[in-house]
């Protein structure tokens, strides 16, 4: 909002000045419009520079946390902990501490919200993923209403929340936001949705989702799940082959807890 306001003022002042100085309305209008766009560009570059500095701070926190987790893993290999659960709790604490630090850093974007109307929705989308990792689903639901859903992860989180709340818009959201994905993203999204439909005993919808995804992906898990459904082996449907990508959605817990020690940090 401020960007447009300041640009309009700068353009108007420049237009008036050059109209008077050059005694030409045409040149005055041209210079005014040029000043407007140049002002917008300079403000955008300034915001990008400031945002870049914050992003580097966030990346530093993530890298430090990953390094600490790696050191713990090496330590566990040398001196195994008393139980896998204890090791998992230590790793999750490292992850959660990093997530909370990242959320604090996200607040540094706030002063620039008034300069870029899309920035709040972009940062909210980032916070959605962070709060989801912390399993603070109430905050996730609140932020999803004010987020820009551009990346696959955020869209899948919304799909999960719609499923968990038995929201009737689940099918519409999947068809409008996730059916056009290709490759691994498309395969994973289709298998997540199909898993939900199997749980709801809507097998035809599950098969239809996988058939559509097969046109854009030859992912092994996708093909295996399609064969299971085609042969009516509904209880054998499994997304375990996607590993942590699947378990990080919290729809299922891994059968072997140790698998999650390698969970992706963010």
Language-model segments: residues:
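N-terminal topogenic membrane-targeting module
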Residues: 24-124, 143
